[in-house]
Amino acid sequence: YPVILLTLLLLASCKSKKNMVATLPRPVLNSDSIYPDTANAIAGLFSPDHSQLKELNVSKNKKQNTKKKTSTDTHESSDLVLRGTKITSSSVDVSSVYTGVDRVVKYDFTHRDVPEAFEGFRIAFISDLHYKSLLKEKGLNDLVRLLIAQKADVLLMGGDYQEGCEYVEPLFSALARVKTPMGTYGVMGNNDYERCHDDIVNTMKHYGMRPLEHEVDTLRKDGQQIIIAGVRNPFDLGRNGVSPTLALSPKDFVILLVHTPDYIEDVSVANTDLALAGHTHGGQVRVFGVAPALNSHYGNRFITGLAYNSAKIPLIITNGIGTSKLPIRVGAPAEIIVITLHRLTE
């Protein structure tokens, strides 16, 4: 393992920070196959001569434009229609302005069950802050500024908030500065069940945030609604192997918030229209799309970006922001996710 790590670090040192910001995987779909070709998506997308990567990269002239403080280069990564759903995505490099966050990944999520009142509804999603690991106080303050700048309607959080109970209060005190019309919701990660669970729950409630542990809440607007469901400890399937979405109506638009992406394959998450997860850190250390250590038992299938479970339910997996074990990221840029909802009208 030390030899592998040293090799990865040497490779990383040969690349600039901007070049190490990976583009999003692009699902490859055809009439005979619903799922992305995982081998192509992982083994090929980060290779310099891969045709899909060439499509995603911005032009050389745009890369050389250093006058702008924030890059507005966008990378179209997927455009598909599946079971009444259309999803497109782009990324914006913010690493030159904000400490601790490399990019904002934006999704336009179009679905037939999105209510008209929620057309243009913006969701900010963050996960795996692991405060204070790689994310320090300045990075946290920059993260708050960046989240405020997104003007989201709701903030969702995917767990693994801290690397010590002494960091819980300052973390949520800072995040409380992010005010959204529909509030802030969060689930717990494995770190949060190992330590500080009660501190986190109580601190979130103190700052007006809503922890969701096998619970659902309804967001209402102009007489219409969408539902946010949150999973309690997804690693304990003996207690939590029944999804909180099963009792919901298939007519509602339902977002499932869960720490690990494996959960949506391990159990039935019927009535879910979109799932959001973290946990993987995008591999955390990844060179040419290959990570020596993966914390999903589905391997490369659920690592980062847009994926689907066997029931064809779309899942967005974030790289997250912080780190665990080693305070380093290579080829897995720290990111926040912004999702804009649209109603499919065709």
Question: Where are the regions that the model predicts?
Answer:
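Acidic, histidine-bearing metal-coordination/catalytic regions of metal-dependent phosphoesterases
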Residues: 14-122, 133
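Extended active-site neighborhood of metal-dependent phosphoesterases/phosphodiesterases
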Residues: 84-85, 91-96, 108-110, 172-237, ...
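Membrane-embedded segments
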Residues: 100-102, 114-202, 207-210
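Beta-strand-turn-beta hairpins that frame and shape the catalytic cleft
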Residues: 102, 111-124, 209-210, 217-230, ...
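Active-site metal-binding loops of divalent metal-dependent hydrolases
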Residues: 127-131, 159-161, 190-191, 215-216, ...
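Conserved beta-sheet core of the metallophosphoesterase superfamily
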Residues: 176, 261-340, 344-345
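Short beta-strand/loop segments at the ligand-binding rim of alpha/beta enzyme cores
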Residues: 246-256
